[in-house]
C-alpha cells in the first residue's frame, strides 16, 4: 500500500488520545477524518475533516462515516478505533447495565466501524486497522471486570479480523495500554505518580508505527504499552 498522502479515520478523536493520534498522523502527512460524539478540535496543518454527533454504537452511523471519508478524500487507508469508555465498579456493587454500557462503548463501536470498512478494504485488497484494547484485556484488576471483559473482546475481534483477512493484505492490530496520563486520570488518582503512566503521545507513536510499512509483518498482535505501571 502506498504511503503517499494516506487517509485515516480516527474515532474518539475529541479525547486526549484521539487528539494525540491526530496530531502525530497529521505530522506524517495523513489526511484525516476525525469522528466523535463531540465535535473534535483540529488545529494541525494536515488536511482534516472533523465530524461530531456520531454515535458509533449505531451501525448506520459507522457506515455514514465510511461514506463521508470516501466522499471527502476518495480513498481510505486506515482506521484507528479509539472511541470507548471506562467505568470502575466492583462486581458486588455492579449491575448488568454497567456491563452492557461497557460493551456498547468499547466493543460495539469497534465492531460497527470494522463492519463498515471491511467491504472497502476487501475490495481494494489492503487496509490497516488499529483497535484500542487495554492491558486489562489479559488480566482484570480490582473494579475492572466489565471494562476488562469488553477490552478482551476488542482484542479477540482484532485477532479474528487479522486471521480472516490476511490473504487480502488487510492488517489488524491492537494496542494494550495501562493508565493513560490524562487530566481525568490525574484528578481520579491524585496520589499516583503520572510519570509512571503512558503518555498519549507515546501511544500515538506506537499506533503510527503499526500503520507504517515498518510493521508490515505484524498482524493480529496485541501490543502492550504499559509505561512503568
Regions found by a protein language model. Name each.
Residues 94, 140-148, 160, 185:
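Active-site loop-to-helix junction immediately N-terminal to the catalytic Tyr of the SDR YXXXK motif
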Residues 119, 163-164, 216:
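Alpha-helical segment proximal to the catalytic Tyr-Lys
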Residues 134:
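Residue(s) in the substrate-gating loop at a strand-loop-helix junction
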Amino acid at each position: 500500500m502506498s504511503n503517499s498522502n494516506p487517509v485515516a479515520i480516527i474515532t474518539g478523536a475529541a479525547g486526549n488520545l484521539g487528539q494525540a493520534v491526530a496530531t502525530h498522523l497529521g505530522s506524517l502527512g495523513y489526511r484525516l477524518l476525525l469522528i466523535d460524539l463531540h465535535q473534535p478540535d483540529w488545529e494541525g496543518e494536515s488536511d482534516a475533516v472533523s465530524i461530531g454527533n456520531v454515535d458509533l454504537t449505531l451501525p448506520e452511523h459507522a457506515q455514514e462515516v465510511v461514506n463521508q471519508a470516501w466522499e471527502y478524500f476518495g480513498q481510505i487507508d486506515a482506521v484507528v478505533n479509539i472511541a470507548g469508555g471506562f467505568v470502575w465498579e466492583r462486581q458486588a456493587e455492579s449491575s448488568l447495565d454497567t456491563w452492557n454500557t461497557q460493551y456498547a462503548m468499547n466493543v460495539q463501536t469497534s465492531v460497527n466501524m470494522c463492519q463498515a470498512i471491511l467491504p472497502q478494504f476487501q475490495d481494494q485488497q489492503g487496509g490497516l486497522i488499529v483497535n484500542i484494547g487495554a492491558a486489562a484485556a489479559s488480566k482484570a484488576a480490582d473494579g475492572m471486570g466489565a471494562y476488562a471483559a469488553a477490552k478482551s473482546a476488542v482484542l479477540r475481534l482484532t485477532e479474528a479480523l487479522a486471521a480472516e483477512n490476511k490473504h487480502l493484505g488487510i492488517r489488524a492490530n491492537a494496542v494494550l495500554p495501562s493508565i493513560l496520563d490524562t487530566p481525568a486520570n490525574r484528578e481520579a488518582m491524585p496520589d499516583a505518580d503520572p510519570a509512571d503512566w503512558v503518555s498519549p503521545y507515546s501511544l500515538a507513536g506506537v499506533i503510527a508505527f503499526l500503520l507504517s510499512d515498518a510493521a508490515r509483518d505484524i498482524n493480529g498482535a496485541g501490543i502492550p504499552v504499559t509505561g512503568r505501571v
